[in-house]
């Protein structure tokens, strides 16, 4: 890194984010050893770089998702006032104005630029210096602050500390005196270490910081000091304007700055604000000027400054050394507990068992170490990307490594060796086509065009969320370059395509994706929370057993030391160290199965959540229906009405090229109004646009033919083209000339200007030049609903709505086209025209009609989801009538059911927004309406026969909403009415990306566990907001969703749900099995302790390694059941459905072991334990009988808990598990049949001889136990619990239990009202 110099430029820049496509192995990397103890995680944060596809809102809670935390904890912990707007200063949308004092300046040589910037962006000061503390969540003593990290959707508390030397020395002494035990405790409980050795200190003078998230994750970071001799404003840029206290300089010269690196984000201390800020909103004042200024590049001093502030442009994950990984692994509580257990067993003379467990632990540590190291290295290799780039610095072009790029650097993207963007950048010249599938899941290539002067101002003004208008110029780090077109300079020379770096390193989109992988958010899924509560309860039981065993052994005269060892041994039995690891068994197998089916998961904890889905929302086009629509034909105006469909484009074009008739304009619209590009000899772009263009049979060219022919006759236009370096594509008809003698260039249409499709506007437009004529036209295509607002009323045919309704009712997709002549429009004027000027006063041309085919699997999947009582809804940007038709064809709506479509009452149009009225009219019958207040059908059945059929159909009506109505309902409808609508609405059409996101949140507010399946950039926000998002994309890992399917079929939804349910059931089964295994062994050992006996060394080994380990692993390999059941599996570990059978099984285990003990003691060959012996007794009939019968219990309880249908296949279909059970049963019977006390295995297992009749009894008792355990698990225990619960409710006169889910309660209320 270059050292800073004394004299530096005061220009500023900004930092942002880079992102690369990570492969499917990332899923397994999240399953690393530590994760099973650190708790579940989920990478759900969305980088700001793609937030233009995402409505930035905080997610509401749902049963399965991370509930939005209350800041009460952080406020109380750090004694802070939370800022009012929910964002820190660094995150505020008014970031540029928050701290600017009226009339005070910060810059000297940049004052004019900054004032112009603030004036043009209409930015006004909001807070003065004295209000900074409250606004920023700063404590009164300056020791703490709260910071909202928008990209991570994370709010953290930051506190400053200094080390108290005397208490630190005391801490060291305590660690020595306790032989390291205190060190381990403080290591596992870092809060207590911080409170013990640290003293609160203002952030300005602190030596180290603690940063704590709302999830309780704590980090201790040393403050670094970076030498830096320059002004403060050069670090924080023009974004922050601070009014300094009287008598102090508001832009001081500093010699160094203080910072910490938190999760690969740099937090720099601002001395005037007394708080740490993230360097992600840094803006260069030059960006407010035009692009020509930016193209001048940077000077050496500015480069050194920015390297110093932002660091290298490199995503370099810290790779821990082998010794660090080994220490972290060995000092984990799991292995410390193992070491404690091994020492304990050795002291109790269980040497063989202790040695085996030690070997297994060492192998496990080494295996985990190797796997973790390999995973980290692979992730580092894939996230780390460097390449040579040509950059313009100090007035010269030079080649440097991409790691040396800094914000503001101008580099060439047309370099053939550049295939992936090394940083987030803004396109300055030329255009390009990129693949952004790893960001949005959108498999369609995206076109990028050069930024304008207005774009530069928008770049300066945006904070965290990149506006949609800027995305067309924005090049995201890690995205692949498909094609780059160089700008036009002259007929013999092409220019270079240039881009300016905007964000570097971990601040890029790629960096945000990597961070979301390595720092996943915890999920609030109740299973994980309950499982650790259950472990705590088992530990308490172990303590109770400890006390009773100690008292019993004491009465038998056993030495105190032996009593302590034996009693502590009970704790290792009741709380087996491997118990937490069983939580991941089902998830691991599920992820492996999904990967084989082409479904990749970057968030393993979402697998179990998918098993609880209540509602799935689908996008339509490309998800439910085919992406590549077939064009049916076009309908053009004939006279005063729209005519029949024309399936051939040959008769649309007039022989007079200057004519302005409807058919010709429709043809020109289809030929030009698109964003297609040629890549490797093939057209790429939106499939709908490709179908539309191919229908015209015109040809597309990017060879600049038009520009070469125009210079002689249109000098002004030619000069402008060369100045602006424009390369417009051209399209040509399939014939050489109609009937007139036109040259080839006369027939060309040059696409002079393109206004790309915007979801909110639902249209796109182009400005087109006709050959060598001066004639220029504007052509627009978009949703039919928006045409009345941009077209002349008199241009619409009389049957406009009738024709539109006909096609949409029948499921066709309709695109409307319009055009107008641009009078006296030159090329230069066309480039300066605003979109509003082009898209107004248009003449309607006609309709393009596409056939909206369902995908072959859509109807089957929807039917299976409906059969499983998983609600399905459609959320699309398409026409509402088309969507309703598709919904009926796929089974989302009943074919003969009523669908009501609300629209705004025309009489209330003039009223204020909140007072507008909705008219709820049935699509199938214009005479049937819903009452706007009760949402009940309001119809007179006098004319409708038969009445019973009409009533039945109306009782089960559904609702379809459009985006504008949905927005009004969210803002103004009464909550109870809105909830009622959400319960009945199945179709949501004309929804913008932000409205899709908000719809998911609304469903989550009703306690639905929501899934969303989509395929494009418009779905990105909804995919992230949903509890389970499934993106249909070719990319293996996408930031768009936790799940990515490379197959463009919604069958992946069924696969995810089935495997999620199977994984959830497997997790419960494995956990219950480990719990009952502990219970069986605890009961056995507790009974034996009454006679100072215990199991033998190899008996413990046989149970733990030969029986338990294979069963626990292989019982999780059961595949999901082929059909979805109506009822979802429970996710509550402490529910009666789980606890009742568990308690019943424990009682049954006790009874079987007690009966076995009573019978063996009555046998004439019974060998009792030695009386009054202080040594451990192993070789006696009590131990032999209980060991053998418990072996059957370990095996059979595994079979009982290996649940089959309706969530998993039948247990015998799990062939590996079946084989293990059979082998173990054979081994157990063999041990029972041993007779000769001289037999090797008799001696090894320290067994005593038994009679033939008793052996038969043990086998019979094992079979009886299995039958009782199986029937009890499946029928008896639950039935008994339900009966007792019902009887208790009757006696206490309690009401029936009310569902915790709001939507279920609302449905019940609706049914009661209908009755």
UniProtKB/Swiss-Prot annotation:
One Gene Ontology BP term is: monoatomic cation transmembrane transport
Q: What class of enzyme is it?
A: translocase
InterPro entries in UniProt: ATPase_P-typ_cyto_dom_N, ATPase_P-typ_P_site, ATPase_P-typ_TM_dom_sf, ATPase_P-typ_transduc_dom_A_sf, HAD-like_sf, HAD_sf, P-type_TPase_V, P5A-ATPase_N
Could you list the residue ranges forming a coiled coil in this record?
Answer: none
Q: Where are the transmembrane segments?
A: 140-161, 168-190, 325-347, 351-369, 532-551, 565-586, 1073-1091, 1100-1117, 1136-1159, 1181-1203, 1217-1236, 1254-1274
Which species does this protein come from? Schizosaccharomyces pombe (strain 972 / ATCC 24843)
Q: How does it sit in the membrane?
A: Multi-pass membrane protein
Sorted alphabetically, the keyword list is:
ATP-binding, Magnesium, Membrane, Metal-binding, Nucleotide-binding, Phosphoprotein, Translocase, Transmembrane, Transmembrane helix
Q: What is the name of this protein?
A: Probable cation-transporting ATPase C1672.11c
């Amino acid at each position: 890194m270059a050292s800073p110099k004394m004299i530096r430029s005061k220009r500023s820049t900004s930092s942002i984010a880079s992102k690369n496509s990570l492969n499917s192995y990332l899923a397994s990397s999240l399953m690393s050893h530590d994760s099973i103890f650190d708790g579940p995680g989920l990478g759900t944060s969305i980088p700001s770089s793609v937030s233009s596809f995402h409505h930035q809102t905080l997610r509401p809670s749902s049963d399965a998702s991370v509930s939005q935390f209350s800041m009460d904890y952080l406020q109380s912990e750090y004694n802070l006032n939370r800022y009012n707007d929910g964002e820190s200063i660094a995150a505020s949308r008014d970031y540029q104005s928050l701290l600017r004092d009226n009339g005070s300046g910060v810059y000297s040589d940049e004052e004019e630029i900054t004032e112009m910037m603030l004036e043009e962006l209409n930015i006004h000061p909001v807070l003065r210096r004295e209000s900074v503390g409250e606004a920023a969540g700063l404590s009164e003593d300056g020791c703490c602050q709260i910071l909202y990290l928008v990209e991570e959707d994370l709010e953290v508390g930051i506190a400053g500390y200094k080390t108290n030397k005397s208490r630190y020395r005391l801490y060291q002494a305590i660690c020595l005196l306790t032989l390291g035990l205190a060190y381990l405790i403080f290591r596992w409980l870092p809060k207590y270490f911080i409170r013990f050795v640290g003293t609160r200190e203002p952030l300005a003078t602190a030596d180290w910081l603690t940063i704590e998230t709302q999830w309780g994750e704590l980090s201790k970071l040393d403050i670094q000091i970076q030498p830096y001799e320059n002004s403060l404003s050069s670090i924080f840029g023009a974004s922050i304007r601070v009014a300094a206290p009287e008598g102090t300089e508001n832009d001081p010269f500093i010699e160094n700055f203080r910072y910490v690196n938190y999760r690969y984000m740099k937090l720099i201390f601002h001395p005037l604000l007394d708080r740490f800020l993230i360097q992600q909103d840094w803006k260069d004042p030059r960006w407010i000027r035009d692009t020509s200024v930016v193209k001048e590049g940077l000077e050496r001093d500015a480069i050194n400054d920015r390297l110093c502030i932002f660091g290298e442009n490199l995503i370099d994950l810290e790779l821990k050394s082998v010794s660090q990984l080994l220490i972290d692994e060995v000092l984990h509580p799991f292995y410390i507990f193992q070491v404690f257990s091994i020492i304990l067993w050795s002291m109790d003379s269980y040497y063989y068992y202790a040695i085996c467990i030690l070997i297994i632990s060492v192998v496990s540590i080494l295996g985990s170490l190797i796997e973790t190291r390999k995973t980290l290295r692979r992730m580092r290799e894939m996230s780390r990307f460097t390449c040579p780039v040509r950059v313009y610095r100090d007035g010269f072009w030079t080649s440097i490594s991409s790691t040396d790029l800094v914000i503001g650097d101008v580099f060439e993207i047309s370099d053939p060796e550049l295939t992936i963007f090394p940083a987030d950048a803004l396109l300055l010249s030329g255009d390009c086509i990129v693949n952004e599938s790893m960001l949005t899941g959108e498999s369609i290539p995206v076109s990028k065009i050069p930024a304008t002067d207005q774009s530069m101002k928008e770049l300066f003004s945006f904070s965290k969320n990149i506006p949609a208008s800027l995305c067309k110029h924005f090049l995201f780090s890690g995205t692949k370059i498909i094609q780059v077109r160089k700008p036009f300079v002259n007929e013999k020379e092409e220019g270079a395509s240039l881009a300016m770096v905007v964000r570097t390193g971990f601040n890029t989109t790629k960096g945000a994706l990597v961070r979301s992988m390595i720092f996943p958010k915890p999920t609030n899924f109740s299973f994980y929370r309950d499982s650790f509560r259950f472990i705590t309860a088992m530990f308490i039981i172990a303590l109770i057993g400890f006390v009773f065993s100690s008292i019993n052994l004491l009465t038998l005269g056993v030495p105190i030391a032996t009593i302590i060892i034996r009693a502590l041994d009970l704790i290792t039995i009741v709380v087996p160290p491997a118990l937490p690891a069983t939580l991941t068994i089902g998830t691991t197998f599920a992820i492996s199965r999904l990967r084989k089916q082409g479904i990749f998961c970057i968030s393993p904890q979402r697998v179990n959540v998918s098993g609880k889905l209540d509602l799935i929302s689908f996008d339509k086009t490309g998800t439910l229906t085919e992406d590549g629509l077939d064009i049916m034909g076009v309908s053009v105006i004939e006279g005063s009405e729209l005519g029949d469909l024309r399936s051939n484009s040959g008769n649309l074009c007039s022989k007079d090229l200057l004519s302005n008739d409807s058919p010709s304009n429709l043809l020109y619209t289809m030929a030009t109004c698109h964003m297609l590009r040629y890549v490797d000899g093939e057209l790429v772009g939106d499939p709908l646009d490709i179908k539309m263009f191919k229908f015209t049979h015109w040809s597309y060219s990017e060879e600049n033919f038009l520009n070469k022919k125009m210079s002689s006759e249109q000098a002004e236009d030619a000069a402008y083209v060369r100045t602006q370096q424009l390369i417009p594509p051209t399209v040509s008809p399939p014939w050489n000339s109609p009937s007139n003698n036109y040259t080839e260039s006369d027939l060309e249409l040059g696409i002079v200007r393109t206004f790309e499709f915007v979801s909110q506007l639902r249209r796109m437009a182009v400005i087109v030049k006709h050959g060598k004529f001066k004639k220029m036209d504007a052509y627009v295509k978009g949703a039919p609903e928006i045409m009345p607002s941009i077209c002349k009323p008199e241009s619409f045919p009389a049957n406009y709505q009738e024709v539109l309704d006909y096609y949409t009712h029948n499921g066709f997709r309709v695109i409307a086209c319009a055009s107008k002549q641009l009078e006296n429009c030159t090329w230069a004027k066309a480039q300066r025209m605003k979109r509003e000027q082009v898209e107004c006063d248009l003449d309607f041309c006609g309709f393009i009609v596409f056939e909206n085919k369902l995908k072959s699997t859509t109807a089957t999947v929807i039917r299976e989801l409906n059969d499983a009582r998983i609600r399905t809804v459609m959320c699309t940007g398409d026409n509402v009538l088309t969507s309703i038709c598709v919904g009926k064809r796929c089974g989302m709506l009943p074919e003969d059911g009523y669908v009501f479509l609300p629209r705004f009452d025309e009489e209330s149009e003039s009223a204020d927004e909140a007072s507008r009225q909705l008219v709820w009219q049935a699509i199938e019958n214009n005479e049937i309406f819903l009452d706007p207040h009760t949402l009940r059908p309001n119809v007179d059945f006098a004319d409708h026969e038969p009445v019973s059929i009409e009533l039945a159909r109306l009782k089960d009506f559904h609702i379809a909403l459009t985006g504008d109505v949905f927005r009004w309902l969210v803002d103004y409808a009464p909550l109870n009415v809105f909830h009622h609508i959400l319960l009945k609405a199945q179709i949501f059409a004309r929804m913008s990306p932000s409205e899709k996101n908000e719809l998911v949140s609304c469903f989550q507010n009703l306690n639905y566990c929501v899934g969303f399946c989509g395929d494009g950039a418009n779905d990105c926000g909804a995919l992230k907001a949903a509890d389970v998002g499934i993106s249909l994309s070719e990319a293996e890992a996408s930031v768009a969703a936790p799940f990515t399917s490379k197959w463009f079929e919604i069958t992946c939804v069924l696969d995810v749900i089935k495997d999620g349910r199977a994984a959830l059931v497997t997790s419960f089964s494995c956990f219950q099995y480990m719990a009952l295994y502990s219970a069986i062994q605890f009961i056995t050992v507790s009974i034996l302790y009454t006679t100072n006996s215990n199991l033998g060394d190899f008996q413990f080994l046989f149970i733990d390694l030969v029986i338990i380990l294979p069963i626990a692993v292989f019982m999780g390999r059961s595949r999901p059941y082929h059909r979805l059941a109506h009822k979802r599996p429970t996710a509550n570990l402490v529910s009666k459905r789980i606890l009742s059978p568990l308690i019943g099984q424990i009682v049954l285990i006790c009874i079987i072991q007690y009966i076995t003990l009573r019978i063996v003691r009555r046998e004439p060959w019974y060998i009792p334990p030695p009386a009054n012996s202080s040594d451990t007794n192993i070789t006696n009939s009590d131990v032999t009988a209980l060991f053998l019968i418990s072996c059957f219990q370990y095996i059979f309880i595994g079979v009982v808990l290996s649940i089959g249908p309706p969530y998993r296949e039948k247990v015998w279909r799990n062939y590996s598990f079946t084989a293990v059970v059979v082998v173990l049963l054979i081994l157990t019977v063999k041990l029972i049949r041993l007779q000769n006390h001289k037999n090797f295995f008799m001696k090894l297992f320290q067994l005593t001889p038994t009679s033939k009749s008793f052996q038969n009894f043990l086998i019979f008792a094992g079979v009886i136990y299995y039958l009782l355990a199986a029937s009890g698990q499946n029928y008896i225990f639950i039935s008994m619990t339900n009966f007792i619960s019902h009887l208790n409710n009757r006696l206490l006169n309690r009401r029936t239990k009310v569902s915790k889910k709001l939507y279920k309660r609302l449905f019940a209320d609706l049914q009661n009202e209908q009755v």
